[in-house]
């Protein structure tokens, strides 16, 4: 279901009205004016200066009011820059008074583009969980050496309680993380304020879960989820809630590595053609970050096994411990699986760049599934498919499937929130199969943990 932003359409209607009034002498050269502002209220005919003042006052204050309302109640998307530019051209046209209204025509084109993006580039509501259990959510801080912030999604008792809304973003730093990632990964990145504006609507994104209730059982299977690079602990809420609705207790950890790790502002780490010494330095930095992640996961496993989370769930006993991770998180859970034995490990398109040579050749100790994309977006040293092939050559027991149409961004919730923008920058090939691919990932994940066979239809999705 599409998420509606009312103030987007109000802004569009406001600027369309202003442009029509301003250009009515061109659009309707013979017919009577749509609105004769020369005779409105106290403004008298032939008082052109007063006419301009009245109209500019109306347009300017209308713009300010609607922009402020949108900012404080909905936030801006990247396409909001189009409507801001349309207003700018419109008021420049008013100030300069070009006879052919050329700037006003530019404003009209920008407004049409803006309306087109509202229709063509939707933001989707997070899909509802389809499992048989109600799901609850709580945010906790683990008593480990990192004081790790953790989101817990769990199946709870159904006492006909209400669902409540929770903020999707755990803090206000996400746009900065995405900006820093863009600096690293692209040849050119816009200014940070562009990201602050274009992603501010994420501050108003919520997900729903039941008000806090007891667990359905004191003995349940546990999943520890490790998020991808530059993401956060709530970034996979749709998947985590689906897993919780199937009867799993999901602990989604917050990792704290830096996105841009040093102060060489001109360094483009991810681009092809970097000097080997820079790539080597970057690999060592990310390798140290990988060790931080491993410590967080291992400490949570130890706490679960020794029942040291009584403040979260009293007298809870995990029936099994399973690890799931995406991208950097995928590498994290694979690395843990090389050191300790858990019930199962699932890695979504793991980013193996931080692995050293010894780790690339070390075997995992448990049942492991890797789901990866069928096609690389661009050639990048940091995501060379040869790394995964080399890892699998030394781990032949791992089940590995390439999924048709899968891009690296799946299964992040951003695929529902900024799918069109991700297509534009090449993170997604298309935004047409979002729900299908995310549902497939969820289904394969659950069946693997339950040791069930994939269906014939699911096997057809493997390349």
List the predicted regions and their residue ranges.
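Extended, compositionally biased non-globular segments that define protein topology
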Residues: 1-84
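Domain-level recognition of soluble alpha/beta enzyme cores
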Residues: 113-222, 431, 454
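Active-site machinery of serine-nucleophile hydrolases
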Residues: 168, 173-183, 187, 234-277, ...
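Short substrate-entry loop that stabilizes the transition state in hydrolases
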Residues: 205-220, 225, 229-262, 377-380
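The feature captures the conserved acid-bearing segment of alpha/beta-hydrolase catalytic domains
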Residues: 216-217, 344-410
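Alpha/beta-hydrolase active-site loop
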Residues: 265-315
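Gly/Ala-rich beta-loop-alpha elbow adjacent to hydrolase catalytic centers
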Residues: 324-329, 333
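C-terminal catalytic-base region of ester-bond hydrolases, centering on the histidine
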Residues: 389-463
């Amino acid at each position: 279901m599409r998420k509606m932003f009312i103030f987007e359409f109000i802004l569009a209607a406001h600027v369309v009205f202003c442009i029509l009034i301003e250009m009515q002498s061109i659009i309707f050269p013979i017919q009577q004016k749509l609105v004769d502002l020369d005779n409105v209220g106290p403004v008298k005919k032939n008082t052109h200066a007063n006419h301009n003042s009245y109209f500019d006052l109306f347009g300017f204050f209308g713009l300010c009011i609607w922009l402020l309302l949108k900012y404080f109640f909905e936030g801006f998307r990247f396409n909001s820059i189009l409507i801001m530019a349309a207003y700018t051209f419109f008021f420049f046209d008013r100030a300069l008074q070009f006879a052919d209204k050329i700037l006003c025509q530019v404003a009209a084109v920008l407004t049409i583009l803006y309306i087109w993006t509202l229709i063509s580039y939707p933001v989707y509501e997070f899909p509802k969980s389809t499992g048989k259990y109600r799901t609850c959510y709580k945010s906790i801080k683990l008593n480990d050496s990192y004081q790790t912030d953790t989101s817990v999604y769990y199946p709870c008792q159904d006492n006909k309680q209400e669902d409540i809304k929770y903020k999707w973003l755990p803090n206000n730093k996400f746009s900065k993380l995405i900006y820093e990632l863009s600096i690293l990964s692209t040849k050119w990145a816009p200014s940070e304020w562009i990201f602050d504006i274009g992603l501010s609507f994420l501050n108003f994104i919520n997900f729903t879960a039941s008000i806090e209730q007891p667990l359905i059982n004191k003995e349940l299977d546990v999943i520890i989820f490790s998020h991808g690079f530059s993401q956060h602990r709530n970034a996979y809420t749709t998947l985590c809630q689906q897993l919780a609705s199937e009867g799993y207790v999901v602990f989604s950890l917050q990792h704290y590595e830096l996105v841009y790790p040093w102060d060489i502002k001109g360094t483009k780490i991810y681009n092809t053609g970097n000097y080997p010494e820079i790539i080597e330095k970057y690999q060592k930095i990310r390798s140290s970050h990988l060790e931080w992640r491993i410590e967080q996961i291992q400490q949570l496993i130890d706490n679960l096994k020794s029942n040291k989370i009584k403040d979260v769930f009293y007298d809870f006993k995990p029936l099994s411990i399973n690890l799931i991770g995406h991208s950097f998180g995928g590498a994290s859970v694979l690395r843990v699986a090389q050191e300790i034995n858990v019930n199962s490990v699932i890695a979504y398109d793991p980013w193996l760049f931080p692995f050293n040579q010894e780790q690339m050749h070390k075997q995992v100790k448990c049942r492991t599934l890797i789901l990866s994309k069928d096609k690389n977006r661009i050639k990048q040293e940091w995501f060379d498919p040869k790394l995964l092939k080399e890892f699998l050559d030394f781990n032949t027991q791992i089940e590995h499937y390439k999924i048709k149409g899968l891009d690296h961004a799946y299964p992040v919730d951003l695929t529902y929130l900024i799918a069109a923008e991700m297509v534009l920058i090449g993170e997604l090939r298309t935004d047409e199969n979002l729900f299908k691919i995310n549902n497939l990932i969820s289904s394969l994940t659950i069946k693997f943990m339950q040791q069930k066979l994939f269906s014939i239809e699911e096997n057809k999705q493997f390349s």
